[in-house]
Amino acid sequence: MTVQKRSVPLDGMRALAIIAIIFYHLMPHVLPGGYLAVNIFFILTGFFVTASVIKEYSEKGKLAYKSYLSRRFHKLFFPLLSMMIVVTAYITLFQRGLLLNLRPWILSSLGMFNNWWQISVGASYFEQFYVQSPFMHLWFLSVISQFYIIWPLVMLLLLALYKDKRIILYTAVLLSLFSALAMGMLYVPGEDASRVYYGTDTRLFSFMIGSALSVVWPLERLDEPVPKQIGRRLTLAGLLSYAVLGVMFSSMLDSQAFTYRGGMFLNSVMIGIAVVLTAHPANFISKILRFKPFQWIGRRSFLLYLWYYPVVSLYQAKVVDTSVDPGRHVLIQLVLILCLSEIGYQLFEKERRKIPFGPSWRLGDTFSKRKLSGSLGFTGHFPEKIFATGSVCLLLIALTGLVQAKSGENADVQELREQIAASQSKMEEINRDASARSRAINNIEGLEREVVLFAHDADITFIGDSVLLSVSDQLVTIFGRAVVEGAVSRQLYQTTEVIADLKKREQLHDTVVVFLGSNGTFTRTQMERFIKEIGTSKDLFFLTTNVPR
């Protein structure tokens, strides 16, 4: 297949994307819309895959499909497999509780259908009260892999039938609209959004926007020189597009209905505009994104994506409480992510190595020496046998863990899920008739009768996360007129719509107790906004409980 030329400023855009994704998981209160950055990768994938297929078809009248797939999947497979071996070996040695159900996670990821498997078993991208798997982020690679396989075949069929690349543009636009519509229709407000977040059908619009742009504005056209006045306009438009994206990344929450009913589609359209503007050399933003730090990160964006989630999930499961000196914990995780990603980059991008137990590896290679150089900061001879021996040892440990891994539901997690589900159902029932509720006032052990009577008649609103849900029964037993508003993984900055709804239902009482902070920290500005939305006339109390996640 014809090799598509690399766009240096778009590498810089990849850097911005992976930075946003990582900080969404490390500091979600700082960048609550960072999850939207995956759309950048989807759009760039659609852009370059479409450009490559059209270019080869126009030059040769056909597509070397087998060669195309081999090249694409070779770049994905070996770094992916190496990451999974290292992480599984680590889990086997140090965090054996995460071996539960590990086999289907690995098989679905290597088989490139992880996103649909997660949907089928009800895995949630947004639940944070326990670590489900260090491989949860691999849904992303499965979606991209499915696009790699299917879209070129669709394009070949269209080109063979209509002999005009504009049919690809029309098809891409139509499919993007259908996909966005499917996301909006399948999303159920108030329920977990993982189905529409993971689905290839509901994320297709981002790829299609990239594909449409590739037909309308191929990179060759974007390289054409323009007058300085046009360049200034491009810069102004680029700054405006990045400003809009900045607002989206800082304000579009994963819990909002708007996000899935048009918001994510609009975000992808805006990213598409930013891609075209960024790629043009006359745009000043293009010059900024050519800086070496952006290029360094952008060229390693795939390895950074592979490693960030295992590091974050395993570190936070091990440390448990990162609220004490959070800056230090963030720095440690960033260093680990960068180091592991750089090792992978040196081995698989610079050295083009294959893991030493695949079909292309030969025993004689073990005793050869290869020169390793690059941004690790040294040059010299790297003994292949050390690499091979270490890889085989890690593989054996990982295989041992896989053999020992059990299937089934974590008993503690299952009990907590059932308790929370029951509490949510009861919470809705409680809130429907909170003001008219009447029940016998029983004595409560440890509380004086006077206190029991006062608590029973107190008008209190409780707002919180799964911690609140887990104790809602006990709260209502004591506070007979309470309104309880809880949700799994809720964070303080996600409460704007909740407060507005409580006000609309006239259930925001003069006393408000807040159970938030277990799922992450928040900024002073977010706290001030929260207090303002509640109202300064209210009596406001905060309770935060640190629990193992």
State what each model feature region is:
Residues K350-K503, Q507-D510, T521, R549:
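Extracellular/periplasmic envelope-modification machinery, especially enzymes
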Residues F42, S67, G111, T461-F462, ...:
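Structural recognition of the beta-strand scaffold that forms the well-ordered cores
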Residues I106, I478-F479, T536:
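Short, structured coil segments at secondary-structure junctions
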Residues D11, A17, I460-G464:
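Short, hydrophobic/glycine-enriched beta-strand segments
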Residues I40, I478-R481, R529-K532:
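Glycine-rich, phosphate-binding/catalytic loops in enzymes
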Residues R6-L10, L16-I386, L396-T400:
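Hydrophobic membrane-embedded alpha-helices
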Residues G246-V247, D254-S255, E497-R549:
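Alpha-helical cap/lid subdomain in secreted, periplasmic
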